[in-house]
Design a protein with these regions (language model features):
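Residues that define the transmembrane beta-barrel architecture of outer-membrane proteins
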Residues: 52, 88-92, 133-139, 156, ...
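Residues on the lipid-exposed face of transmembrane beta-strands in outer-membrane beta-barrel proteins
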Residues: 45-46, 58-60, 94-98, 108, ...
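Surface-exposed strand-loop-strand hairpins of Gram-negative outer-membrane beta-barrel proteins
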Residues: 28-30, 62-91, 190
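Bacterial Sec-dependent N-terminal signal peptides
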Residues: 1-27
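Outer-membrane pore/translocation modules
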Residues: 115-250
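Outer membrane beta-barrel transmembrane domains
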Residues: 69-78, 228-365
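Transmembrane beta-strands of outer-membrane beta-barrel pores
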Residues: 60-66, 110-116, 147, 164-170, ...
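Short loop/turn motifs that connect adjacent beta-strands in outer-membrane beta-barrel proteins
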Residues: 25-28, 44-53, 65-67, 103, ...
Length: 365
């Protein structure tokens, strides 16, 4: 019973961070959209769902993307030739959760992003230069409900959520580019601070206790972006005539799925929980609602995700490091259209990271 109440306590708080930080570790551009973490670890001796309470969560995420993939094939020559694109992205997430009773809660999250992108092709092709962006990202507001009464259900539970992603991040962030003469223009889609769309968020989170030490967790997340394009010029049309319909930035959907298991130590180490699981995140070729025109880099990353948590009475420290095991830059809408027009399979590329580093802390206020 004590283990269950601890586990239930952290779920609504720890759900705050991983999901919105669905950054897909690279040029498959899924930026942070408010706070979300995962249903991994126990914390606190009080049952979060049994009383009215506030929780504040802060987390940090970093990755460096530099390995180019076209489909699942790595373009190793990019690093040999020195023309790979290198993205550095840091995200600071702040989220606050209000628990109303044992069923209902609401979460508001807002990220702050700091991005650097180094390339040759955006700066004339001969010299490497960097572009930059920083500022708040897109906010998310989600209302969640547990399906079963935590006072009566002790083996497991399922939480469903519905919310919105608001376009609070700048989707036309600009930096200086060097093509013969310096010029200020929009940065690449992968380091834009927002996407300009009002998204519809749906999520399902669940856990199941196997024993007093072992439990399982799952998270399913989808954000539908009905807006088609956001008006931010990409300059893709200047690269090749076949990319003319990619001159405008698309507003893509996002998805995340996680499945794993937790082990909570006993005795003097009962505050420590370790977890392991798999994580799938990315953006689809076509959106669930509305058109899918403009430029996007669709694809996904499948990662192995070790994590740990250390819980005190009113505070929880957590960290995880998703390690990419499969990276796939899928055919975009433009790729498919050009494949039909030429009779030859066309597919673009994207840069991915090997791993990302995530850590944070949650407080009961």
């Amino acid at each position: 019973m004590k283990f269950f109440t601890k586990l239930l306590a952290v779920i609504a708080v720890y759900i705050l961070f991983n999901n919105s930080n669905v950054n897909a570790q690279g040029c498959v551009a899924i930026r942070g959209n408010g706070s979300f973490q995962t249903m991994d670890h126990p914390m606190l001796d009080t049952t979060i769902a049994s009383d009215k309470s506030w929780y504040l969560t802060a987390s940090y995420r970093y990755f460096k993307s530099f390995r180019h993939f076209s489909g699942t094939a790595e373009q190793k020559q990019r690093q040999v030739l020195g023309n790979e694109v290198i993205n550095h992205q840091s995200t600071i997430d702040l989220g606050i959760t209000r628990n109303f009773d044992q069923f209902w809660s609401a979460t508001v999250g807002l990220p702050y992003l700091i991005n650097t992108r180094s390339s040759l092709y955006e700066h004339g092709g001969k010299e490497r230069h960097s572009s930059y962006s920083h500022g708040i990202g897109d906010m998310r507001i989600v209302v969640n409900r547990w399906l079963f009464d935590s006072h009566k259900t002790h083996k497991g539970n399922i939480q469903v959520g519905l919310g919105m992603k608001l376009p609070t991040g700048n989707f036309n962030a600009q930096s200086t580019f060097y093509n013969v003469t310096p010029a200020v223009r929009p940065v690449d889609q992968s380091i834009q601070l927002g996407d300009g769309g009002t998204g519809i968020i749906a999520e399902v989170n669940g856990f199941l206790n196997f024993t007093s030490k072992f439990s399982g967790y799952t998270n399913l997340y989808y954000m539908a972006n009905p807006r088609n394009v956001n008006g931010t010029r990409t300059y893709r049309e200047t690269l090749r005539a076949t990319l003319a319909n990619e001159a405008n930035s698309s507003v893509p959907d996002q998805f995340l799925a996680r499945l794993g298991a937790n082990y909570t130590f006993q005795g003097h180490n009962s505050a420590l929980t370790v977890s392991g699981g798999m994580r799938l995140e990315g953006i689809p070729v076509y959106d669930l609602i509305g058109k899918s025109d403009g430029f996007r880099r669709p694809g996904y990353v499948l990662s192995a995700e070790p994590s740990l948590s250390y819980s005190l009475r009113k505070i929880n420290f957590f960290a995880n490091v998703p390690i990419a095991v499969k990276r796939d830059r899928t055919q975009s809408k433009t790729d498919k259209e050009n494949s039909i027009a030429t009779g030859t399979r066309v597919i673009g590329d994207a840069a991915f990271a090997d791993y990302s580093i995530n850590f944070g802390v949650s407080f009961k206020l």
